[in-house]
């Protein structure tokens, strides 16, 4: 939040953020994960509250367009009503939610991205390092549809850094990403560096300056 106060108006072409939803989602997924896949995450308390409205006002100020995950949990804090939501259809059943929603500032129709992200039915296996991690393929789809010409992107809650990996793959995106949790930052940095070491052309040529390194 502090860093945004020094950012000029409309500095970023797009802000894609996944802030805490304020519903205890992280700990809930920790329990579900133990039951289904034995994946354990550390106990967290940052997901008990969603950001204050001043955060969302700043996001709108510093970026030309915004995509905000989980906004259905704090809709009253959104800058304005929008017809264009993104629905990530997880193609899963049972007690789990059918998918996740993101509010956007775009004026197009609601769009759906279908990608299986549960248990043995995952379309593309990914190492899970964060309780609210999203697949890289989701961000690939977002950039293709909402930022095809590239540009500057802000992510205030980096988490697993799936967004950053997708930006590296795109090759035409300048990404500014922040993560304040030291443990998640360390794990995510290792994940990104592993991706860079695997021979992707753009990954090899794109240098990352780790501003939050501890």
Feature-to-residue mapping (PLM):
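Class I S-adenosyl-L-methionine-dependent methyltransferase catalytic core
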Residues: 1-154, 160-214
């Amino acid at each position: 939040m502090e860093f945004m106060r020094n950012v000029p108006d409309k500095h970023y072409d797009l802000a894609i953020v996944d802030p805490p939803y304020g519903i205890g989602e992280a700990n809930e997924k920790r329990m579900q994960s133990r039951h289904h896949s034995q994946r354990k995450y550390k106990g967290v308390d940052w997901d008990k509250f969603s950001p204050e409205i001043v955060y969302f006002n700043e996001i709108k100020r510093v970026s030309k367009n915004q995509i905000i995950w989980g906004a259905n949990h704090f809709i009253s804090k959104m800058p304005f009503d929008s017809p264009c939501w993104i629905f990530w259809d997880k193609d899963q059943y049972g007690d789990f939610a059918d998918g996740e929603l993101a509010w956007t500032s775009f004026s197009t129709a609601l769009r759906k991205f279908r990608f299986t992200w549960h248990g043995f039915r995952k379309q593309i296996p990914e190492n899970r390092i964060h309780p609210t991690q999203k697949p890289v393929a989701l961000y690939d789809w977002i950039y293709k549809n909402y930022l095809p010409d590239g540009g500057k992107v802000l992510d205030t809650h980096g988490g697993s850094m799936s967004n950053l990996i997708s930006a590296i793959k795109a090759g035409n995106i300048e990404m500014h990403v922040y993560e304040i949790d030291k443990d998640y930052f360390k794990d995510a940095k290792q994940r990104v560096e592993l991706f860079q070491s695997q021979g992707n052309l753009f990954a090899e040529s794109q240098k990352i300056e780790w501003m939050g390194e501890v």
